[in-house]
Structure formats: structure tokens, C-alpha cells
Design a protein with these regions (language model features):
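Glycine-aromatic micro-motifs
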Residues: 2-140
Length: 140
């Protein structure tokens, strides 16, 4: 399956955008494509001044795998809303906390998806999230 049509990219989400989590509503209208895994390690970022709740950060280090849910977004406005949540500015990646990258996905109905990769300070990373699963690790 294609990662991206003219206006409908596939995203793989691993944290607060997952089903049952606090920001999942931003995916209303997106087509669910199933769960899978991406390579990397999921880290906890504790509550901070700019975000009043803890959240996960994906580091693409290839050392383990992270549980993701894949969705085909409804179009550019929905993707822009996700970018805002993730503090990603496609026109200024250097100033972005996360960057959106296309990566391989294992075990899902898609082979590749766009995922938000953390590029902020590693000093903000608290601890690895067990099993690379935000939901099973108690996140929300």
C-alpha cells in the first residue's frame, strides 16, 4: 500500500495519538489500517512547561521495536494538525521538536508509514518505555 496519495499520507502513531489516548481525537476521520512495529526505542518525556502531560519520544536507533497504529489521514488539514501537536514545522526542521519521516512498518497492512521521530535534547528523555508500548506502559 502506498505511504502517500495526493493528499492522504499514512502515519504510524505510537503515543498520545493512539486509540484510547488523550490526543486520539485528532485522528477522527482518518482510516485505521491496523497495528504494527517500527524500529527504535520509545522514551518517556516527563511533564514540561510547554506540555502539561508526559509523552513518548521515538529514537530511531534500531535497538528494539516500538508498537504503532497506522492511519491514512483524511488530508492536508489533518496532517497539519498532527504536525502542530508534534511541534513539527516542515519549513523549519531545525527548530522542530520532532521530524516526520517515512519508515518501514512490520506486521501491519502497510509496508511504510510516516512517523514522528524525536530530535529534541536527549537530556529531556527520562527512561525507556518497557516493550516500546506506550499504552501497555501506562501512557495515555
Amino acid at each position: 500500500m502506498d505511504v502517500e496519495g495526493p493528499t492522504s499520507p499514512v502515519v504510524a502513531v505510537y503515543g498520545t495519538l493512539r486509540r484510547g489516548c488523550r490526543n486520539h481525537g485528532l485522528l477522527d476521520g482518518a482510516e485505521p489500517l491496523g497495528a504494527g512495529f517500527v524500529d527504535g526505542t520509545l522514551w518517556l518525556v516527563e511533564t514540561e512547561e510547554h506540555r502539561a502531560y508526559p509523552y513518548p519520544a521515538l529514537i530511531r536507533d534500531g535497538s528494539s521495536r516500538v508498537v504503532v497504529e497506522c492511519y491514512r489521514v483524511s488530508g492536508a488539514p489533518q496532517l497539519a494538525a498532527l504536525d502542530r501537536l508534534e511541534s513539527f514545522d516542515p519549513d523549519d526542521e531545525a527548530a522542530s521538536e520532532y521530524v516526520r519521516r517515512t519508515v518501514p512498518v512490520a506486521g501491519a497492512s502497510v509496508d511504510r508509514a510516516q512517523v514522528y521521530v524525536y530530535r529534541g535534547s536527549r537530556d529531556r528523555l527520562s527512561r525507556p518505555i518497557p516493550g516500546g508500548d506506550w499504552v501497555a506502559g501506562g501512557g495515555g
